[in-house]
Design a protein with these regions (language model features):
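Residue(s) in the substrate-gating loop at a strand-loop-helix junction
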Residues: 138
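Conserved glycine-rich cofactor-binding loop
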Residues: 9, 16-18
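Short, small/polar-rich loop/turn modules that mediate ligand/substrate recognition or access, typified
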Residues: 170, 175, 237-239
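Substrate-binding pocket helix/loop in short-chain dehydrogenase/reductase
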Residues: 96-97, 101-109, 207
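Short C-terminal tail/terminal secondary-structure segment
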Residues: 143, 227, 238-251
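Active-site helix of classical SDR
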Residues: 120, 154, 162
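Alpha-helical segment proximal to the catalytic Tyr-Lys
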Residues: 125, 167-168, 235
């Protein structure tokens, strides 16, 4: 059976854990050469070892424009082009309105909005016509979530990027889409509950109770959706948002 990404050059930002790592593994399994980025060298080395020989790790902070420039220069030198760009780096923390501070706002929007914007902008000269750009959103962007307003607003911005950039890039046939996960069992999610294992499990159980399918998702389930959007199977899909959330956003 033919592999869906045979011979493609794929970039996964934030590819050292969770959804990013699972997606990088799937891209490699489907035949792509995968460049993964991360901010910590130890995690990056471990991710490359887990993905296998088709992976290359590049230390880069997506919110730092100088590091993005270096990232793209290296990809230009080593691969010459980008067929698939998965903009996954980001994150956030929970604070109610009265406790939000400037540093939290700047960090969240810096990673999720500024980072996404300039990652795609810097990659434009390397993106082939007809490339697939996939942005990681979140289903909280379309609903109210207590103590999560900054993160939710940042992901609403990401959702609009896909709409607007689809028009900006239509002459090149570049498809820009958003994957919006619901509760997925990743380190980033469980860490919201703090270091206590019982509290982490309580958070997962609470979130599972709000999902029509009755559970939280697995990173590999999001990775499967990313493979679909990256491949020719999604050749007529652009500017859209694919929810991978067990139906949570639909109720």
């Amino acid at each position: 059976m033919a592999r869906k990404l045979e011979g493609k050059i794929a970039i996964v930002t934030g590819g050292t854990t969770g959804i990013g790592l699972a997606t990088a593994k799937r891209f490699a399994t489907e035949g792509a050469r995968v460049f993964v980025t991360g901010r910590r060298q130890g995690e990056l080395d471990a991710a490359v070892a887990a993905i296998g020989p088709r992976a290359t790790g590049i230390k880069a902070d997506s919110a730092n424009l100088n590091e993005l420039n270096r990232l793209c220069e290296r990809i230009k030198t080593e691969a010459g082009r980008i067929d698939v760009l998965f903009v996954n780096a980001g994150g956030g923390s929970m604070l109610p309105l009265g406790s939000i501070i400037e540093e939290q706002y700047d960090d969240t929007f810096g990673r999720n909005v500024k980072g996404a914007l300039f990652t795609v902008q810097k990659a434009l000269p390397l993106l082939v016509d007809g490339a697939s750009v996939i942005l990681t959103g979140s289903n909280v962007s379309i609903k109210g979530t207590p103590a999560f307003s900054v993160y939710s607003a940042s992901k609403a911005a990401v959702r609009n990027f896909a709409r607007s950039w689809t028009l900006d890039l239509k002459s090149r046939g570049i498809r820009v889409n958003v994957i919006s996960p619901g509760p997925i069992k990743t380190p980033g999610l469980v860490d919201l509950a703090g270091p206590d294992a019982a509290q982490q499990q309580s958070l997962l159980d609470t979130m599972a109770s709000t999902v029509p399918l009755g559970r939280v998702g697995d990173p590999d389930e999001v990775a499967g959706a990313a493979v679909f959007l990256a491949s020719s199977d999604a050749s007529f899909i652009a500017g859209t948002e694919l929810f991978v959330d067990g139906g949570q956003a639909q109720i």
